[in-house]
Swiss-Prot record:
GO terms for molecular function: adenosylhomocysteinase activity. The gene is ahcY. Its main location: cytoplasm. Transmembrane segments: none annotated. It comes from Chlorobium chlorochromatii (strain CaD3). Its EC number is 3.13.2.1. It is found in: Cytoplasm. Pathway: Amino-acid biosynthesis; L-homocysteine biosynthesis; L-homocysteine from S-adenosyl-L-homocysteine: step 1/1. This is Adenosylhomocysteinase. PANTHER family: ADENOSYLHOMOCYSTEINASE. NAD(+) binds at residues 197-199, 231, 260-265, 283, 318, 339-341, 387. Keywords: Cytoplasm, Hydrolase, NAD, One-carbon metabolism.
């Protein structure tokens, strides 16, 4: 039986934090010229009028500026965080007080997390979203998996593989009991999703290959002004912030092992070296390994590096990169953290369920593990994103790049009709995003003469590089 109900207004930790949140949002706006330029450009046009946007993305001060930009452009928005530890409670309170339904607080349980994700997919009048802003793909996953369950209800009888899957299936079980065609109706109304991060993009391509993707998707992550800025320069600053706030450790003189040398790994390795650490990189890709070596980093296997490192950082987006056996072999007082999207890069479940290991909570998001040999290890943010779990994430300026791309992607999906596939934003928009951020940092561009433009075969107004160009 289908029922129509009014959607919940909001659920946050403490609405009285709204004034503090608003003050920080106003500061962030000054550091986010891309988003503010879009507000000015589209003032009065409301290019997202009629759009119902479900946002599953870290509920931070910077995200608040994105949310209010989407609202300014005409959208009806509901929001949740995409990580149980990443919400800044004062940011959530400010957005809730401004009238946007937000369901997020720092330190959610997995059951609460998936409940919050469900709330953003339930608009007034029993409607679902017609657009999604996703980070990691959980909102998209809930719709896709719910749709599959409606086709094959026996899926609800499966034994969950872990606590996260158990919590997700519980929400889907409740939805199915209320309306066994809910997700078919939601999917039919969807115009698309824009995905923020590498992990979520991998999910989208996998769904597309399997024929499971139900609506168009724009891969925001691989826009140059996202991956080469947010992933690289953002991590270069926020990793150290998270480690230091959590531990107060001196990085200089330490050995830091960075697992993975993609854009995120590059930012992390350079960050740690800039603080005076000796950095060892582990890699599976010969190209990335060669890049790391050419930058002067030692490249080794984890089996060799595990005995040397004082600090370990996973950046791969893969699972079981640091195993329980690795952790048992580490030096005394090692610090272990992750800056990839999910918590399965480190075998946290195995660690927590090992009866020979003693666990002592030091403070929120900092846990001490004592092994049978007497050595101890500190795990930050329970193996989830250290920069958001133990600090406040990337700086506003670099997030303006990413979120300007997200806003443009939402406009693109709303105003045009796309076939089901995974797309990227055109290079002209990528260049425009960069251009919007130049004045703020005092950059003046050289302009091609007509003769120069003709000589290299481009327009004087861009795009300046072919699609295959690697920045």
């Amino acid at each position: 039986m289908s029922t129509v109900a009014e959607a919940l207004a909001y659920k946050v930790a403490d609405i009285s934090l709204a004034e503090w949140g608003r003050k920080e949002i106003e500061i962030a706006e000054k550091e986010m010229p891309g988003l503010m330029a879009l507000r000015k450009k589209y003032a009065g046009q409301k290019p997202l009028k009629g759009a119902r946007i479900a946002g599953s993305l870290h509920m931070t001060i910077q995200t608040a500026v994105l949310i209010e930009t989407l609202v300014d452009l005409g959208a009806n928005v509901r929001w949740a965080s995409c990580n149980i530890f990443s919400t800044q409670d004062h940011a959530a309170a400010a957005i809730a007080q401004a009238g946007v339904p937000v369901f997020a607080w720092k330190g959610e349980t997995l059951d609460e997390y998936w409940w919050c994700t469900r709330q953003i997919l339930e608009f007034d009048g029993g409607l679902g979203p017609n657009l999604i802003v996703d980070d990691g793909g959980d909102a998209t996953l809930m719709i896709i998996l719910g749709h599959k369950i409606e086709n094959d209800p026996k899926m609800l009888d499966k034994t969950p593989g872990n606590a996260e899957e158990k919590a997700l299936y519980q929400q889907l079980r409740e939805v199915f009991a209320e309306d066994n065609q809910r997700w078919h109706k939601v999917a039919a109304d969807m115009k698309g999703v824009s995905e923020e991060t590498t992990t979520g993009v991998h999910r989208l391509y996998q769904m597309m290959e399997k024929g499971e993707l139900l609506f168009p998707a724009i891969n925001v992550n691989d826009s140059v002004t996202k991956s080469k800025f947010d992933n690289l320069y953002g991590c270069r600053e926020s990793l150290a912030d998270g480690i230091k706030r959590a531990t107060d450790v001196m990085i200089a003189g330490k050995v830091t092992v960075v697992l993975g040398y993609g854009d995120v790994g590059k930012g992390c390795a350079h960050s740690m070296r800039s603080y005076g650490a000796r950095v060892i990189v582990t890699e599976i890709d010969p190209i990335c390994a060669l890049q790391a070596a050419m930058e002067g980093f030692e490249v080794a296997t984890m089996e060799d590096a595990v005995h040397e490192g004082n600090i370990f950082v996973t950046t791969t987006g893969n699972k079981d990169v640091i195993t329980l056996e690795h952790m048992k072999q580490m030096r005394d007082e090692a610090i272990v953290c992750n800056i990839g999207h999910f918590d399965n890069e480190i075998q946290v479940d195995k660690l927590n369920n090992d009866p020979t290991v003693k666990i002592i909570n030091i403070k929120p998001q900092v846990d001490k593990y004592i092994f049978p040999n007497g050595n101890c290890m500190y795990l930050l943010a329970e193996g989830r994103l250290v920069n958001l779990g133990c600090a406040t994430g990337h700086p506003s300026f670099v997030m303006s790049n990413s979120f300007t791309n997200q806003t443009l992607a939402q406009i693109e999906l709303w105003q045009k009709e796309y076939a089901v596939d995974v797309y990227r934003l055109p290079k002209a928009l990528d260049e425009e995003v960069a251009r919007l951020h130049l004045e703020q940092i005092g950059v003046r561009l050289t302009r091609l003469t007509p003769e120069q433009a003709e000589y290299i075969g481009v327009s004087a107004d861009g795009p300046y590089k072919p699609e295959h160009y690697r920045y």
